């Protein structure tokens, strides 16, 4: 064979070696992008990467779903044994259980009664449940000033019972914001479909056929009747949770909180117990992940299921399996003090007892409705319909039925 014939073979061999080297480099880059996977089913699993990520973090953001409360006896929504499936079987529904959580549920009396029965049951389960190890872990992070924010999709109010995880309803429009941001509302509170009325949840409100009329709306109509004015449509009471195809009453506040948290440069994101199906939650996770990676921090996924393709490339650490088991094993490694449940019952003063509108529990506050500004104690009284009624009654001469004083009405802001 001539020398000229050897040259193409040598060149082809070199080309193949270069391609092989490039492919190996690409494979290495791909592997470096894949998250580290830990399975709680393996008793010998090394949790040191998870411990290291949490220890070095100073500003942790946590996004949670129903999976963190299953161990407390509260069902999730989408699993085969979840709330949607059980509702369909219990009430023999032709529709999916998800449709009971749609904003159109109040258009049909039968759907309303089923929805209210489900709400009473869910509130009872939540009220009797105890926070899980993961809830206590979140409280510990807050007490150690490592938790920047907790965004929860849960309505069971287990988080807000614990120290450091307080929230308020409605959310304020400007800082300071509470540690816990309920993305879907809470079963601790009922609200009016028309006015700004808020009250602590009472199961008796939903233990009847149909709906319960808002007391503030009834009082307002009584004032208007005495003043010789036309009556207005009265709202009804409902749990202050966000249903599918509804506008979130605190959407602007949540957007402001997210913007502020991104500016605070979080260095760790923990996504726990959620499949991330809600578009708004997806956006929060993606934006927070990008911000965390800019700070050279870690994005941690804790769930039975592995992350979807949308989130797989965002995660640095995937802990797949029972997240309660993971936290129990993590606890001694972090050298955390004993995590004790703070007493949910607190002594109330006579002033607090006289006003359920001021405070629901030791951890969840009811604040003034969004958009109402009060300049003084006198002006805040004038916004109260009961005070207006008192004014009107005092302005009536007996026996002459004559109104001497024109009554002004503060238009309540819709939720």
Curated annotation (Swiss-Prot):
GO aspect biological process, one term: DNA repair-dependent chromatin remodeling
CC terms in the record's Gene Ontology section: chromatin; chromosome, subtelomeric region; mating-type region heterochromatin; nucleolus; nucleus; pericentric heterochromatin; rDNA heterochromatin
Catalytic activity: N(6)-acetyl-L-lysyl-[protein] + NAD(+) + H2O = 2''-O-acetyl-ADP-D-ribose + nicotinamide + L-lysyl-[protein]
Subcellular location: Nucleus, Nucleolus
Binding site for NAD(+): 65-84, 153-156, 273-275, 303-305, 323
GO molecular function annotation: histone deacetylase activity, NAD-dependent; histone H3K14 deacetylase activity, NAD-dependent; histone H3K56 deacetylase activity, NAD-dependent; metal ion binding; NAD+ binding
Region annotated Disordered, chain positions: 1-26
Superkingdom to which the source organism belongs: Eukaryota
InterPro entries reported in the protein's UniProt record: DHS-like_NAD/FAD-binding_dom, NAD-dep_sirtuin_deacylases, Sirtuin, Sirtuin_cat_small_dom_sf, Ssirtuin_cat_dom
Positions with a binding annotation for Zn(2+): 192, 195, 214, 217
Signal peptide residue numbers: none
Domain Deacetylase sirtuin-type residue range list: 40-337
Active site: 184
Keywords: Metal-binding, NAD, Nucleus, Repressor, Transcription, Transcription regulation, Transferase, Zinc
The protein's required cofactors: Zn(2+)
EC number: 2.3.1.286
Free-text cofactor note: Binds 1 zinc ion per subunit.
Entry function: NAD-dependent histone deacetylase, which contributes to both telomeric and centromeric silencing, proper cell cycle progression, DNA damage control, recombination, and genomic maintenance.
Family: Belongs to the sirtuin family. Class I subfamily.
Protein name in UniProt: NAD-dependent protein deacetylase hst4
UniProt source species: Schizosaccharomyces pombe (strain 972 / ATCC 24843)
């Amino acid at each position: 064979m001539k020398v000229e014939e050897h040259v193409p073979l040598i060149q082809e061999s070199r080309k193949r070696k270069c391609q092989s080297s490039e492919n190996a480099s690409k494979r290495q880059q791909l592997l470096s992008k894949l998250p580290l996977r830990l399975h709680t089913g393996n008793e010998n699993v090394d949790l040191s990467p998870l411990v290291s990520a949490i220890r070095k973090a100073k500003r942790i953001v946590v996004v949670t779903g129903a999976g963190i409360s299953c161990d407390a006896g509260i069902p999730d929504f989408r699993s085969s044994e979840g709330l949607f499936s059980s509702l369909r079987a219990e009430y023999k529904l032709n529709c999916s259980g998800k449709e009971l959580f749609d904003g159109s549920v109040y258009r049909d009396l039968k759907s309303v009664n089923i929805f209210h029965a489900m709400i009473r049951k869910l509130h009872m389960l939540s009220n009797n449940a105890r926070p899980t190890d993961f809830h206590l872990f979140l409280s510990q992070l807050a007490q150690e000033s490592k938790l920047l924010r907790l965004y929860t999709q849960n309505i069971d109010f287990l988080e807000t019972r614990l120290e450091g995880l307080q929230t308020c309803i409605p959310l304020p429009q400007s800082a300071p914001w509470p540690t816990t941001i309920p993305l879907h509302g809470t079963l601790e509170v009922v609200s009016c479909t028309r006015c700004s009325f808020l009250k602590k949840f009472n199961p008796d409100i939903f233990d009847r056929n149909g709906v319960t009329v808002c007391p503030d709306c009834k009082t307002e109509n009584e004032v208007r009747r005495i003043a010789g004015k036309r009556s207005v449509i009265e709202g009804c009471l409902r749990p202050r949770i966000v249903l599918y195809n509804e506008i979130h009453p605190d959407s602007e506040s949540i957007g402001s909180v997210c913007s502020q948290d991104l500016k605070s440069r979080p260095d760790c994101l923990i996504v726990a117990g959620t499949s991330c199906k809600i578009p708004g939650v997806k956006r929060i996770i993606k934006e927070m992940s990008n911000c965390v990676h800019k700070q050279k921090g870690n994005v941690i996924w804790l769930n039975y299921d592995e992350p979807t393709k949308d989130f797989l490339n965002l995660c640095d650490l995937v802990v797949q399996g029972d997240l309660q088991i993971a936290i129990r094993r993590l606890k001694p490694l972090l050298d955390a003090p004993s995590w004790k449940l703070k007493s949910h019952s607190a002594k109330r003063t006579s002033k607090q007892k006289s006003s359920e509108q001021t405070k629901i529990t030791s951890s969840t506050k009811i604040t003034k409705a969004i958009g109402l500004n009060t300049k003084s104690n006198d002006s805040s009284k004038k916004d109260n319909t009961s005070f207006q009624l008192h004014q009107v009654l005092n302005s009536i001469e007996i026996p002459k039925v004559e109104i001497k004083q024109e009554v002004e009405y503060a238009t309540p802001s819709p939720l």
